[in-house]
Design a protein with these regions (language model features):
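Bacterial N-terminal signal peptides that target proteins for export
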Residues: 1-7
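Bacterial N-terminal signal peptides
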Residues: 8-15
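Composition-driven, intrinsically disordered low-complexity tracts enriched in small residues
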Residues: 138-146
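Leucine-rich solenoid repeat scaffolds
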Residues: 94-136
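N-terminal signal peptide c-region/cleavage motif recognized by signal peptidases
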Residues: 17-19
Length: 146
């Protein structure tokens, strides 16, 4: 399995984006610091590891691992699985694609933010916020990968 990584910047934190791939699964690893990691439009597995990370899965059926630290996860469309790990994490399911995402928040005080009537399933989330499609679109545009 080939993994292609494009390092965008290294200034106190690592920002990484994977090269697009439709025919294979891309695996992306973060560092012990505060990383910004982004997947492709295909299926990705992203391991953020330690640090307060921002993880963007983009389109495709993705698996996102937050690790230690206060992480923020933004999966895209598709059937996505998010594991928050330790820390106070924020997991999103805002794609409005009617897919059964899984949000496993983990230890810490974690928040899941989803579109109302989304079929997402939750585990270990202390707070679940349900937004209207309009509110979700505005939030995704302001902080997610639109």
């Amino acid at each position: 399995m080939k993994v292609k990584l494009l390092v965008l910047a290294v200034v106190g934190m690592l920002a990484v984006a994977a090269a697009a791939s439709a025919a294979r699964l891309d695996v992306i690893y973060g560092t012990a610091g505060a990383d910004t990691l982004a997947g492709t439009t295909g299926a990705d597995v992203i391991y953020a590891r330690a640090g307060g990370d921002t993880v963007r899965g983009r389109a495709g059926n993705d698996v996102l691992y937050g690790g230690a630290g206060n992480d923020v996860m933004w999966p895209g469309s598709g059937v996505d699985v998010q594991y928050g790990g330790t820390g106070n994490d924020v997991l999103h399911a805002l794609a409005n694609d009617n897919q059964p995402d899984i949000l496993d928040c983990g230890p810490g005080f974690d928040t899941a933010i989803v579109i109302e009537h989304d079929p997402a399933r939750f585990r270990g989330c202390e707070q679940i916020l349900r937004l209207s499609p309009e509110e979700a679109a505005a939030l995704a545009a302001s902080g997610g990968d639109s």
